């Protein structure tokens, strides 16, 4: 996947990020036939807020947002062969424009909840 797709993802998210955000961490996880997404924003005091707890956006709006991200990501994932097809994308963006992405190729189908918890311990700090 190239930088263009990452910019597209950020362009989808940027309008709903809260005022004063310093860092945004996005989790995109795919299992057989489904996906899960969530993002966290960090303020200038180092406090992370889960997107589902963010004021100014409701669950229906988030689901629509995540569907737009999936629509952008899925064609790119389909181009990848089996061994290069990632199951989890982590995207970290700071308010100064720095962007970092990590990919995990582990099949999370059988333990998605446990995986997401360990992911959170790694990235949300």
Residue ranges and their predicted role:
Residues 1-125:
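Contiguous interface-forming segments/domains that mediate binding rather than catalysis
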